[in-house]
């Protein structure tokens, strides 16, 4: 049997697809990589939060599964909307890579010059950096990882922010410092490679053989918070679940839409079922003026 693996054409996306292909080939499954440009690849000028729709990097590939053009789609899990087409499912995750954000610069955060220019299109990252350094200036940059790094010199930027996992998976030789995940809580599911397939059929059963169960549970916990609070992919929120004892410690960081206030919630969870109590606590305690937390139905 050969499994057709759909991916975006960027070097990072292809590298991640190749990681999935290697895992499948290790259990005796032949694979073929199919590249396809998404809406998010085509519009590289506007910030993600201004495009006005969710799943800009994943919808086209998922539709290709439904049309039978590919068997699976490989995504960065953080790009997958909290709700996907009901005939599809996230069937597997590879072992989680680094979840940290990285400040790509010859400076670390403390030594960045006054009023330094930092490149990012993420509203979460902008607010986190502003909260740490109110003097910083920001420049919207989009495009693949290599393009963003090239724009540092083109735009005269002092730093850019990106996922450390991307740097590691591409084997890039760039100077960077890791940002503290307790202050710069990453996007939900950052560092996780997810594989989407049809809910029914042989392919899903095969994917279960390459699934990393610990990572899958972390993904479910973080996604459950997003789903229950009805958070959009462009809201200024960081969520991270990590193993702790026999359960998980979760940290959730919420910024007001103006970026001038932040609320942080930490809780120990035994398993996925404990997310309900965390979500209830967040609803009760987050300031109403944040405006994007859905009330309980």
Swiss-Prot record:
Primary role: Tetrapolymerization of the monopyrrole PBG into the hydroxymethylbilane pre-uroporphyrinogen in several discrete steps.
So what does this thing catalyse?
Answer: 4 porphobilinogen + H2O = hydroxymethylbilane + 4 NH4(+)
Q: How is the cofactor bound?
A: Binds 1 dipyrromethane group covalently.
Pathway, per Swiss-Prot/TrEMBL?
Answer: Porphyrin-containing compound metabolism; protoporphyrin-IX biosynthesis; coproporphyrinogen-III from 5-aminolevulinate: step 2/4
Asked if the keyword NAD belongs to this entry, the reply reads no
Q: What else is known?
A: The porphobilinogen subunits are added to the dipyrromethane group.
**GO molecular function terms attached to this record:** hydroxymethylbilane synthase activity
Keyword Acetylation set for record: no
One Pfam entry name: Porphobil_deam
Alphabetically, which GO biological process terms does the record hold? Answer: protoporphyrinogen IX biosynthetic process
The cofactor(s) it depends on are:
dipyrromethane
Q: Which family does it belong to?
A: Belongs to the HMBS family.
Give the modified residues of type S-(dipyrrolylmethanemethyl)cysteine: 233
Could you name the Gene Ontology cellular component terms for this entry? cytoplasm
Write the protein's name: Probable porphobilinogen deaminase
Which keywords describe this protein according to UniProt?
Porphyrin biosynthesis, Transferase
Query: EC annotation?
Result: 2.5.1.61
Gene3D superfamilies the UniProt entry points to: Periplasmic binding protein-like II, Porphobilinogen deaminase, C-terminal domain
